[in-house]
């Protein structure tokens, strides 16, 4: 594991074993943040297992637990004390230990794990609470919570009240130990669409509370292990089904390679199931004798979990952008996370007022998901760093009539105006994105939003970062823009009208536009009194008038005499 490495000024640069970045904290702060997160997880853990109440979403808890382990590894700290398993309240020994399951991160890891292993089967990874069922002489005699894998709580009285769990067995199952998952029964649950629903916490809550016997009717059981059971998997599944554990037989499939595992995984993700799942488990039919089972040592099975629909991401910086209308937007830069195969490294928070209400600072952990069209969305702040160092937002004097001309304070809104005028809604300058505009402005120091019209082909070619092909394309685009109709140039100047309203107005020259009264603008489509007033203010703005004269001097259609 990698240790924090001090630099001369006491700031630490960082990497973790997994390739994820570690926080650039001094040692004292690192120790404090780790201790705070560790205590918070312990508190949530305690509430969850003692009261059956979830103070935080299951997925958030799991991801923050993983984040804690990452931080601990960054500083070379022992991770064995991480509170990711229930506190040991029960003292009932498991006749066979719960091994837990190793997590595989992707298909490549699945292929590697399967290599050299035979007689493999795949099952859905049912999301619930693990339990041991002990049958003696054909009767259910004990039910034990997973606990720490070696011992847990005696849940027998509660388990006897769950109708879906057989109370009697016969044949080979008359004297048997079974391990499985108590889950919340669902009708037609489609995991991809409906998500996890905090199912694990709901099941734990039902089993912990004393006043909800009727709620136990909604619980089911999925048996995933029969220690020392039949070596032949089909025989094992058949006997379980005959005993009343039919789901195991229905949802256990033989697989030969990672492709078949992936097919089953995708099918169960998108199909209607009777339970919530969070991935699949691949297991060998051949298992060691039960006396050799130990927590954390089940190398004959592994899990390939579904990617979470929302990811906990660390805020690395807070940035402000000013749109062409002067609206200030706050953006959180993130340590990159993957959501639905999309690399997410920034999320729009919204207005300064909304950012202040969220109280987000660098170092905070936020929950991010994808909204419509794959746009990252801020869902909640799940953990706040102790240090609340926030940048100061820019002055709020910007509006829809500022920054047509460049200045030190107008940098961001000026760039936003360039991006707008190059869009298809205005002049349609193909290939001109934010990076290109910034490069041109930084190199040639535009005076106003149309200064690029005077650039020569040599000047464009000498712009840093512009290859020959790109320079020639931009030169052609700039020259073609001169032929664009008057209405396109007016849109580029951000007249507060829709394209439909501007077309309906019939104006084809600046002179015509100057003659229009406010009453004329009010009668146009989607243009009421307020917008008509804004058009008059725009037309009378000194910067707009200056730009119209400049465009006339450039012989742009509609601006000359």
From Swiss-Prot:
The gene is ligB. SUPFAM superfamilies: DNA ligase/mRNA capping enzyme, catalytic domain (SSF56091), Nucleic acid-binding proteins (SSF50249), RuvA domain 2-like (SSF47781). Belongs to the NAD-dependent DNA ligase family. LigB subfamily. The active site is at 125 (n6-amp-lysine intermediate). It comes from the Bacteria. InterPro entries: DNA_ligase_AS, DNA_ligase_B, DNA_ligase_CS, DNAligase_adenylation, DNAligase_N, NA-bd_OB-fold, NAD_dep_DNA_ligaseB, NAD_DNA_ligase_OB. The keyword Ligase applies. It is an enzyme of class 6 (ligase). Keywords: DNA damage, DNA repair, DNA replication, Ligase, NAD. This is DNA ligase B. The lineage of its organism: Bacteria, Pseudomonadati, Pseudomonadota, Gammaproteobacteria, Enterobacterales. One of its GO terms (biological process) is DNA replication. It catalyses: NAD(+) + (deoxyribonucleotide)n-3'-hydroxyl + 5'-phospho-(deoxyribonucleotide)m = (deoxyribonucleotide)n+m + AMP + beta-nicotinamide D-nucleotide. PANTHER family: DNA LIGASE, DNA LIGASE B. One of its GO terms (molecular function) is DNA ligase (NAD+) activity.
């Amino acid at each position: 594991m990698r240790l924090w490495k001090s630099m001369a000024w006491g700031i630490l640069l960082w990497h973790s074993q997994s390739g994820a970045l570690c926080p650039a904290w001094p040692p004292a702060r690192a120790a404090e943040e780790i201790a705070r997160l560790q205590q918070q997880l312990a508190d949530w853990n305690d509430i969850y297992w003692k009261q059956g109440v979830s103070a935080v979403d299951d997925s958030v808890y799991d991801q923050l637990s993983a984040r804690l382990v990452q931080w601990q590894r960054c500083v070379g700290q022992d991770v064995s004390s991480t509170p990711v398993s229930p506190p040991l309240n029960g003292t009932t020994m498991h006749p066979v230990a719960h091994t837990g399951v190793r997590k595989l991160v992707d298909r490549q890891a699945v292929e590697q794990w399967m290599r050299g292993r035979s007689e493999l089967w795949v099952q859905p990874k049912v999301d619930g609470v693990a339990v041991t069922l002990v049958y003696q002489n054909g009767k259910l005699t004990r039910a034990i919570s997973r606990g720490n894998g070696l011992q847990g709580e005696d849940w027998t009285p509660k388990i006897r009240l769950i109708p879906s769990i057989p109370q009697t067995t016969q044949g080979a199952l008359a004297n048997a130990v079974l391990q499985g998952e108590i889950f919340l029964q669902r009708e037609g649950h489609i995991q991809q669409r409906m998500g996890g629903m905090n199912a694990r916490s709901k099941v734990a809550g039902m089993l912990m509370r004393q006043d909800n016997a009727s709620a136990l009717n909604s619980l089911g059981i999925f048996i995933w292990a029969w220690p020392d059971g039949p070596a032949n998997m089909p025989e094992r599944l058949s006997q379980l089904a005959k005993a009343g554990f039919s789901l195991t037989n229905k949802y256990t499939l033989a697989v030969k390679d990672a492709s078949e595992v992936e097919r089953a995984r995708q099918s169960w993700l998108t199909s209607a199931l009777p339970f919530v799942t969070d991935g699949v488990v691949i297991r060998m039919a051949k298992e060691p004798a039960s006396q050799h089972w130990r927590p954390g040592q089940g190398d004959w099975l592994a899990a390939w979990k579904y990617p979470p629909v929302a990811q906990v991401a660390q805020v690395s910086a807070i940035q402000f952008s000013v749109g062409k209308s002067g609206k200030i937007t706050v953006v959180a830069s993130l340590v990159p996370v993957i959501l639905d195969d999309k690399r997410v490294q920034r999320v729009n928070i919204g207005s300064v007022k909304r950012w202040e209400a969220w109280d987000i600072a660098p170092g905070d952990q936020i929950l991010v998901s994808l909204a419509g069209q794959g746009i990252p969305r801020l869902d909640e702040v799940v953990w706040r760093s102790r240090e609340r160092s926030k940048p100061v937002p820019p002055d709020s004097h910007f509006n829809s009539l500022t920054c047509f001309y460049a200045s030190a304070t107008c940098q961001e809104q000026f760039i936003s105006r360039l991006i707008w005028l190059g869009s298809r809604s205005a002049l349609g300058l193909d290939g001109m994105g934010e990076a290109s505009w910034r490069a041109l402005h930084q190199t040639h120091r535009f005076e106003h939003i149309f200064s690029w019209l005077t650039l020569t082909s040599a000047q464009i070619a000498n712009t840093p970062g512009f290859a020959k092909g790109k320079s020639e394309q931009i030169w052609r685009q700039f020259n073609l823009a001169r032929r664009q109709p008057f209405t396109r140039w007016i849109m580029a100047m951000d007249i507060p009208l829709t394209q439909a309203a501007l077309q309906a107005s019939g104006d084809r020259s600046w002179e015509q536009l100057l003659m229009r009264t406010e009453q004329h603008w009010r009668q146009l489509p989607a243009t009421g009194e307020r917008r008509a007033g804004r058009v008059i203010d725009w037309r009378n703005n000194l910067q707009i008038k200056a730009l119209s004269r400049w465009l006339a001097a450039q012989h742009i259609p509609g601006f000359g005499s």
